[in-house]
From Swiss-Prot:
The species this protein was found in: Californiconus californicus
Cellular compartments annotated: Secreted
Residue list for modification 4-hydroxyproline: 48, 77
Domain notes: The cysteine framework is XII (C-C-C-C-CC-C-C).
Keywords, comma-separated and alphabetical: Bromination, Disulfide bond, Hydroxylation, Ion channel impairing toxin, Neurotoxin, Secreted, Signal, Toxin
Protein family membership: Belongs to the conotoxin O1 superfamily.
This protein's name: Mu-conotoxin-like Cal 12.2a
Functional description taken from the UniProt entry: Mu-conotoxins block voltage-gated sodium channels. This toxin reversibly blocks voltage-gated sodium channel in cephalopods, with no alteration in the voltage dependence of sodium conductance or on the kinetics of inactivation.
Length: 84
């Protein structure tokens, strides 16, 4: 009887195991928007329209406004106070 109860509980919990074991610090973030992800790096990037954004976006879809462009880590050089 106890074994049956344990098996039933495991069968109910197993489909949700990834929700329990997956943390938000891994690459497969849940509910994180590209805007939130872009705030990780500090630098100056260009939006698709070509205007500069001084909030530390990551160079993924547009080139940086900084003359040297993106570095090896695909992050814009410079800081928030840079005016290019």
């Amino acid at each position: 009887m106890k074994l049956t109860c344990v098996l039933v509980v495991l069968l109910l919990v197993l489909p949700f195991g990834d929700l329990i074991t997956t943390s938000n610090t891994e690459d497969n973030k849940r509910g994180a928007t590209p805007w939130q992800n872009s705030l990780k790096a500090r630098g100056v990037c260009s939006t698709p329209e070509g205007s500069c954004v001084h909030n530390g976006c990551i160079c993924q879809n547009a080139p940086c406004c900084h003359p040297s462009g993106c570095n090896w880590a695909n992050v814009c050089p410079g800081f928030l106070w840079d005016k290019n």
